[in-house]
Amino acid sequence: MAIALGVAACATAQMSVVKDAQRAAKEGKPFSEVVGIITPALTNPETAGSSDTWMVPGKAAYDQYDKLVANKQLHMFKNAQDTINQDMLLVPAYEYYMKALAVDTIIDKKGKPKTKNSKKILDTFVGHLNDYYMAGAELYNFQKYDDAFKAFGIFIDLTQMPQLKKSLASNPMAADSIVSSTAFNQGIAAWQVERFDDAIGAFMNAIKLGYNKKQVYDYAMAVAQAAGKNDTLFMIAQEALPLYGKEDTQYIRQITNHYLQSKDYDNAYKAINQAIEQDPANPQYYVVKGII
């Protein structure tokens, strides 16, 4: 009985924490203060499994972001840091709402799945899609590259969520060309801080999403080379060769170098001969063949 009473008291205490955080959010307390209040409830099993718990800090972040949008429009921002602080709210807002979404589905007494907050969460994502793109661009321009990487990543992830496809269909910012170029920009942000694996992943995602400009292959190859990822460099060069091999011999050079380093002379000859067949008037190809 004592144990049962103790568990009940703990659950009651955690619910009180949630209510305190809700009250602080409604009073317009700083987001960091709301998070500080509710943090114990986010790790307690009695409350962490409830979507309502995660909604509190998520909503607080979005609400404060929206309020700052109005301040920005009224030219109340004093410096760049004000913009950075505003943009930085969007990342935890998304993360908390995703936590809420993950635990929002419950099974009712009839055995049917039921949600409480999902619609609000998804509607909020739709309404803030463009904000994530702008935040990424602003944070990048302020040289907050790690944070720009996160904001760009959230923008991309939102456009790929099946639940949002219909709602975003009429939003020009969700067009494939915008999304794929954002993935490229995300890669550039990672490259700026030498997060080479993340940069390569973003560049490859850009290609997957339809961004096939020459620069994405060139950046991806440069990053792969800097990271010492020769197999990745070889793979990217193979993808770029059919598209841009005629205007730039670096791709066939990388391919043949890969084979030569592993003493695979047959495939090195095969690769350059195929390139010559595709573009017999390219004198650089014969130079490469002569080197082989």
Where are the language model's segments positioned?
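Short coil turns that delineate tetratricopeptide repeat
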Residues: 46-49, 105, 160, 211, ...
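Start-of-domain marker
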Residues: 14-73, 83
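TPR alpha-solenoid repeat register
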Residues: 53, 164-171, 182, 215-216, ...
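Structural motif corresponding to the intra-repeat A-B loop/turn of tetratricopeptide repeats
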Residues: 27-28, 64, 87, 142, ...
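Residue at a conserved register position within TPR or TPR-like alpha-solenoid repeats
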Residues: 24, 61, 139, 183, ...
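Short coil/linker segments at helix-helix boundaries
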Residues: 60-181, 197
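Structural register within alpha-helical repeat arrays
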Residues: 20, 57, 64, 128, ...
